[in-house]
């Protein structure tokens, strides 16, 4: 299932294109443009990465 970056919520399990695996979103910053993943890595969601996959 694909969703827009603006629909990402804390606690969602999302796919990181950079790391190639799923992580839990722990924090959302800058009006949804930057998210913190459960491994502590920041993921920028910009025009090149406008959608993320969530695990069902």
Describe the role of every protein-language-model region.
Residues 21-30:
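Short beta-strand-centered aromatic/proline hotspots
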Residues 33-40:
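Short, solvent-exposed secondary-structure boundary/capping segments
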Residues 1-9:
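Mixed-charge, Lys/Arg-rich low-complexity intrinsically disordered regions
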Residues 40-56:
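Intrinsically disordered, low-complexity, charged/polar segments
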């Amino acid at each position: 299932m694909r969703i827009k970056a603006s629909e990402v919520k804390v606690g969602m399990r999302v796919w990181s294109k950079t790391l190639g695996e799923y992580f839990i979103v722990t924090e959302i910053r800058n009006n949804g443009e930057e998210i913190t993943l459960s491994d502590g890595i920041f993921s920028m969601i910009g025009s090149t990465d406008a959608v993320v996959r969530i695990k069902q």
